[in-house]
């Protein structure tokens, strides 16, 4: 986990993560700035080895760091220090924004590699793409705030990892979420603190909500992210104490830079 926090956190980084298999890396979202490079470094990864990036939606706590990745990739390509290609996957709205921001903010000697060796790959609802040797099926979560996609990855032996983006589960996602080996789902705050953080008016959920969902849909491992950071030192303990009241599977509340074996 490169980051685990929501948009306005200051004590941890915005939610984004890496999946690695046989030294191949798949990155989902980037957070809000150049600190993503720090997070990648301290996660023990090489940014240059991250050849596949997925962006869920256009909100700046997910998108802006992707422009830094575009800059790094294209700058090193221009210097002759980046062999091969890279891909950024998303829906059309996000890809158009990335292309527009890059052309306005970066040098033409760098942006000339976009759509040549840095491929902006549009994905559609229900489309499956092979990424780092795994079938990844992207799906529209039907957000009412900004068009957003999640994904479900085949991780072998009939198991799947499903990421719902940063909004509560929608019934249209059932075929992807149900029976997942791993579910990555947002939990803005504790249910007991819902009157403090107002998650529902922000179209987010609580620990209780996410855990009840995972229990209902037979999820084996639930990982919560995109949280508040008011009491970060106690977040893991407090979230797990609330969550285990509603969920009998394995509940994970990661810190930034924490990793898990899938």
What is each of the regions a protein language model found here?
Residues 69, 73-87, 147-154, 195-223:
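P-loop/Walker A phosphate-binding loop and immediately adjacent motor/lid segment at beta-alpha junctions
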Residues 1-43, 147-166:
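Conserved beta-strand hairpin/beta-sheet module of binuclear metal-dependent hydrolase folds
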Residues 9-11, 122-192:
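Active-site-proximal loop/helix segment associated with metal-binding centers of metalloenzymes
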Residues 5-7, 60, 88, 94-95, ...:
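Short histidine/acidic/glycine/proline-rich micro-motifs that form metal-
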Residues 82-147, 156, 252, 256:
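Metallo-beta-lactamase
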Residues 168-257:
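Cap/insert and terminal regions of metallo-dependent hydrolase folds
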Residues 27-31, 51-57, 61, 91, ...:
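Active-site neighborhood of phospho(di)ester-bond hydrolases with catalytic His/Asp-centered motifs
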Residues 34-86:
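Active-site metal-binding motif and surrounding structural segment of the metallo-beta-lactamase
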